[in-house]
UniProtKB/Swiss-Prot annotation:
Family indicated by similarity: Belongs to the nematode receptor-like protein sre family.
CC annotations in GO: membrane
GO terms classed as biological process: sensory perception of chemical stimulus
Protein name per its UniProtKB record: Serpentine receptor class epsilon-29
Species of origin: Caenorhabditis elegans
Keyword Chloroplast annotated: no
Length: 356
């Protein structure tokens, strides 16, 4: 959606559809219910990760906010829903805006001022900020793992927060500045692709460097004839880096799949290959991604998976059902044993009577 205010444009990653109010109301209720379940899974995911610490504190400082920032995205979505249902009413019709970007002036919302649109613009900024926080945040984590591999001699025992704080400040500066540049149309749709085009190759190179470096360390640790001495903390650091790679590989695959589906959907909508209604599915690939990413993270680490089964509602229900089945099976076995004992006693009694 693009808003034209005099000679300035505001670019929002928001869509408004040509749909009846009743349909929008029902759809919004379904979306809100889905977001509530998603929020529960995400909160449980963060709780388990913080409770059972499997990685270095610096990695936690960088990674946990990437999960938690989903709530920022949903705040932006809730603001959009409020405008769609006219709970927040700017005093004029917003119209239909399905395309993510357009150069056609007739397809832009023309207004004289931002009065009544302040929250909508803020919600759009939150969504832009979320997207670029993920992009630059993943690169920051990759850099942190490179540092952990290079400084393997004493990184595990290092308690200073300089590295994660520095990476957080840099990534947030880039995220906020890029989001504002897109929001106020200081860059076009082509330049908007540069952050992920640049970050993805660098993250991939960091991934392969960390993988090769730590696999080499692992082979050296297992070699009984090695000359280099690895302390317990260094051996732990190598194992941690490899665990992080395994987890990161699965998460990146899931996230890239969601991004690819969103990209394909947006392209199909831009060229009118699919009906506008499908845009609901396309944008919810982004809003509902914790269903896949959080469960992938939890089930990639056995300790987290076991804890999830213990504390989650689904896990408790399955546990109660399993205990009930086991109890019923035990009762059946007990009854069967008792019946067999009775039949055996009766048999021997009849056998004894036949000898009389």
């Amino acid at each position: 959606m693009l808003i034209k205010i005099n000679s300035n444009d505001i670019w929002l990653p928001i869509h408004f559809y040509d749909e009846t109010f009743n349909f929008q109301l029902v759809l919004s209720i379904v979306e809100l219910f889905s977001y509530l379940i998603c929020a529960y899974i995400l909160t449980l995911n963060i709780y388990i990760i913080l409770k059972i610490k499997m990685f270095h504190r610096n990695l936690y400082i960088l990674a946990i906010p990437l999960f938690g920032i989903w709530f920022e995205l949903i705040i932006g979505k809730l603001i959009t829903i409020a405008y769609r249902l006219k709970i927040l009413n700017p005093g004029f019709e917003l119209g239909v805006h399905i395309e993510i970007w357009t150069s056609d002036p007739t397809r832009k919302l023309k207004v004289e001022s931002v009065n009544g649109l302040e929250l909508l613009i803020f919600g759009g900024f939150l969504q832009w900020h979320y997207m670029f926080t993920i992009i630059f945040g993943v690169l920051a984590i990759a850099v942190e793992r490179v540092v952990a591999s290079v400084l393997i001699e004493n990184y595990e025992s290092n308690t200073q927060l300089f590295i994660p704080l520095f990476l957080t400040v840099i990534s947030q500066f880039l995220s906020i500045s890029t989001s504002l540049a897109l929001l106020f149309q200081k860059v076009g749709p082509f330049l908007a692709q540069l952050p992920w085009i640049i970050c993805c190759p660098f993250s991939a190179m960091a991934y392969f460097f960390v993988k090769k470096c730590n696999e080499s360390f692992e082979r050296e640790i297992r070699n009984p004839r090695r000359r280099r001495h690895f302390s317990v903390s260094q051996q732990f650091q190598v194992k941690e880096n490899l665990r992080a790679l395994y987890l990161g590989t699965r998460l990146v695959f899931v996230v890239l799949s969601c991004i690819a589906l969103c990209g394909i959907g947006i392209t199909a909508l831009f060229y009118d290959l699919i009906p506008p209604f499908c845009c609901h599915f396309v944008e919810n690939f982004l809003f509902l991604h914790p269903y896949l990413s959080c469960l992938t993270a939890i089930f990639s680490v056995p300790q987290w998976k076991n804890e999830f089964r213990e504390v989650s509602v689904l896990g408790r229900c399955l546990k109660i059902g399993r205990l009930k089945i086991e109890s019923e099976n035990a009762m059946e076995i007990q009854d069967s044993t008792k019946k067999m004992g009775t039949e055996t006693d009766l048999y021997f009694q009849q056998l004894a009577d036949s000898w009389i």
